[in-house]
Amino acid sequence: MTSGGKVRIYELSRDLGLDNRDVLNAAEKLSIAAKSHSSSISDGEAAKIKALLNSNGKAAGGAKAPAKPDAGNQILSLKKAPSTPSQSAGAPASAPPSRKPEIVAKPAAPASPAKPAPSAPPSRKPEIVAKPAAPASPAKPAPSAPPSRKPEVVAKPAAPASPAKPAPKPVAKPVAKPASAPAPARPAQPLRPQASNRPPQQPSNRPPARPAAKPPVVMSKPTAPPPRPARPGAPAPRRDQNRPAVPMRPPNQQQRPSPQRSGPPRSGAPIRPGAPQRPGMPGRGGAPQQRRGPGGPGGRPPSSLELVGKPIRREPNAPQGRQGGAPSRPGGPGGMRKPVSPGELMQLQKPGSRPTPGDGPRRPPARPGSEAPRRPGEAPNRPNAPTAPPRRPGYRPAAAPGMAGRPRRPDWDDSARLDALRSRSPQKQRQKVHIIGENDDSLAAQTGGFAGGQEALVLQASLARPSKPKNLPGNKGARPVALRRRKKETTRQRQRRRAMELRQAREAKQIRPEMLVVPEGNLTVQELADKLSVESSEIIKSLFFKGIIATVTQTLDLESIEKVSQEFGVPVLQDDIEEAAKKTVEMIEESDLDHLIRRPPVVTVMGHVDHGKTSLLDAIRKTRVAAGEAGGITQHIGAYQVDVDHAGASKKVTFLDTPGHEAFTAMRARGTKVTDVAILVVAADDGVRPQTLEAISHARAAEVPIVVAINKVDKEGAQIDRVKQELSDQSLLAEDWGGDTVMVPVSALKGEGLDKLLEMILLVTEVEDLKANPERMAKGTVVEAHLDKAKGPVATLLVQNGTLRPGDVVAAGPVLGKVRAMVNDSGRRVKEAAPSSAVEVLGFSEVPAAGDEFEVYPDEKAARSVVGDRASEARATRLAQQMASRRVSLTSMSGQASEGELKELNLILKADVQGSVEAILGMLEQLPQGEVQVRVLLSAPGEVTETDVDLAAASGAVIVGFNTTLASGARRAAELAGVDVRDYNVIYKLLEDIQAAMEGLLEPELVESPLGEAEVRAVFSIGKSAVAGCYVTSGSIQRNCKIRVHRGKQLVFSGDLDSLKRMKNDVKEVNTGFECGFGCDRFADWQEGDRVEAFAMVTQRRTLAT
């Protein structure tokens, strides 16, 4: 009670034992303004609402007058007129006051026993069909049933009796008239009702809004063998016998719950199924389901009630009354269902299908979904397509007490919502079918009343079906939960798979490659990380420390790739170098197939520097080439032809000796490109080295067989098995270890194993079946080229097909020439060069490029046309290389220009052969050029001329010669012009001097040079200043040097030492063990115990930043 004589709606509903909505509906009818349960009304308005609700309750009670069972009728129905109010819950007419909550629906006529009434108004109420167990067994009354149960559901007893007789008209009459057995409609043995899983609720006094249009019809039908005999007078135990009746209350027509959404928890609002369950699945409380029990499939009773007809449109806010569970059929196991009181009456009607002997005339089954108008008293008949229990507008059964706070189930309201449920999911579509067990009185809670002028009462809450367990397959939420579980499992599996892939990738990345092959000279950061088997963050961090800001997708140039790879200990091999080893031109043409003969093999000796390649060839040729090489290393590619005795015959073998230094990669690639067999020389005491791996990659790119010569086996510390193991890691497994790679231990100095090595070479070449056509014009490759000061341009050519003769017109790349003379490796002139022969050719107009293919043309005109096109392409390539040699970007140029003049080192490079020029240029590109750029103005083989001197003088360049000489007059011109000319014969020294020249262009940097330390032992004040008396502990202290004063761990002063005295005399330096006085113009806060550190700033030459 609020202040000022006001009463809130929820207090009034609590006093009356009703739901808030009931009180709100009554207030709306009386035009009392009340919006919600917390609205306040006056005492007078509360009294009006109480009077209205009490009067409606008395009317409902009047409808509950006991009706005597008609002995001649098996099917009864209760219905009341629209003007008759419901009986009050507190004063039932004949039922015990607290025996059972009943929901009183508002029928169309006063209560009377159900009879065949042809004049019943048409309604869309479905029919409830009872399927008895025994054929033609009418229901008999239970003498011992409590008298308060007025309506009864008729079921067939076990003993055969007269069948139930339906109404004379098959469809027009809603009541089936039994043929005999004038007993009440209950079997002799009361059945145990299905216990409700929800507590009962207080009775509702809310009157119904409109009378029921027509009741459903229940028909008794035998469908299975007769059940066990019923025991009269033995009712099953009841749990809820003292519950008051619950009258019906009208629904609100403004709110309609969605079939897919449960309404808010309300008092007296039980859960109503939003969609019917499938047959055989246990339903929720109040849902008409098929019961499991003996005598039927799946444990269901042999007979059931079938709901026939289309659901009735419900009002939006109709409260959902509790659906009582149906009692089980006779003959079921004891204690399964509670007995149904005689006051609970339903109409029984036989379904139109499965006729049995003894049954009366049946109604024709209605078409599913048909909504045709019916005659008064006619009920729809759909025996084979049961649907949800219909609800008539204007009726809202109140729920049992204790249902407050329970979520409501949405009800079907119209066909549109039904279609939406049908199309929503297969689960909901299957839930439309109801298979109702025999004597299932839950339909009364949804239909409210029946035809015949009688009122049907709703079952007790204790008879309602319990909610379905969640683990059963029929649970409505089971399918969505399963779907969600599958999604989570899929996500979990995907995460597990990704974690496994990452773990496997991490394990695979533990092994780093022996060599990094860079395609097209660039890689992204992520690709570089994958090739190096490291995380991309490590690459980015390494680049950041080198002053390069990069992202994962940024492309790196070759220089940056080499820097990072060297940090991780992996050498870099450019893909274009490997491509240079591939054989791109086929020397054998189709016209040569008829003239092919066997040719000598071309064997290339490859391996790491100082592993004995040239010494091995010297041992084979019985020469001393290695002794005359500068620096003891090979810096040119050499071609030699050797006669080898094999099987009593002399055979020729052409050997190509390649340099082992890392600068001569292109030379090794060219040697591999023209070879037939690769000899891999590995020192037994050194094992596999970087250039060894490079040689292996070249041989595999050229697709040539590899013969391994394990050299220096006579040397102390030689480990042949270690070399074989390291080679097996590169997929080269020795024959004696079960592989297919020929490995021969040799000693070049002692000549051991050479015969076996030559024999293995010849055996391998025989398998290759090497052939050529000597009758055609020559075709081959330029192995090496240089400019001789006496002979002019000289090129070493390897003839691969045909025969080369003097006078032939040769086109080698963009260079045209005519063969004037040919010299073999022994220095003798030859008249012709057969296939697999290497000769030096004179007569070219200029030095050809090493590695170019040459071909002989029939006349000079044809050769000149080909050369002209190649010259244009070569010129464009050369210009592009010159522009790239500057390696200056706009960013670096602007950054360096802001600091001062751009520093460049201009070079003019002249070498003896083309291969040396390539090697030197390659090494210059590897020098760090972040601060000083190397600009090669001219690079060519040949001697230094006056023209080169003039170019160097004009551009301020340095002339670098490698294994070459100065032309006549060039040295004097250089002295006059002041041009620096350097000549080298070892590539190491050349690279060191060039790097030193680059560092010389850098500005020197100032660095600290420590001098000594002193300790303050006394402080003397002189005017406003102070002097520190110090003792030199180490080194020496010089006047005007830099000092730092430390007090403990704190730096208190850093500056110049202005005064240094000893015994009142100014001195320049004080050594260790002497005392002196310090004076500083800017510092006077001396304290005893201070430590003075003396140092000097000196200039130091800077080095190139790597």
Swiss-Prot record:
Q: Where is this region: G5?
A: 747-749
Q: List, as start-end ranges, the regions of compositional bias called Basic residues.
A: 482-497
Ranges of compositional bias, category Pro residues: 113-123, 138-148, 200-214, 223-235
The residue ranges flagged as biased composition, category Basic and acidic residues, are 408-422
Q: Where is this region: G3?
A: 657-660
Q: Does the keyword Transcription apply?
A: no
Keyword Lipid biosynthesis tagged: no
State the compartments where it is located: Cytoplasm
Q: Which GO terms describe its molecular function?
A: GTP binding; GTPase activity; translation initiation factor activity
Q: Which UniProt keywords apply?
A: Cytoplasm, GTP-binding, Initiation factor, Nucleotide-binding, Protein biosynthesis
Pfam annotation, one family: EF-G_D2
Protein name as catalogued: Translation initiation factor IF-2
What NCBIfam families has UniProt attached to this entry? IF-2, small_GTP
Q: Which organism is it from?
A: Synechococcus sp. (strain RCC307)
Instruction: Report residue spans for region: G2.
Output: 632-636
Listed binding positions for GTP are 607-614, 657-661, 711-714
Cellular compartments per GO CC = cytosol
Residue ranges for the region (Disordered) are 57-434, 466-497
Give the residue ranges for region: G1.
607-614
Encoding gene per record: infB
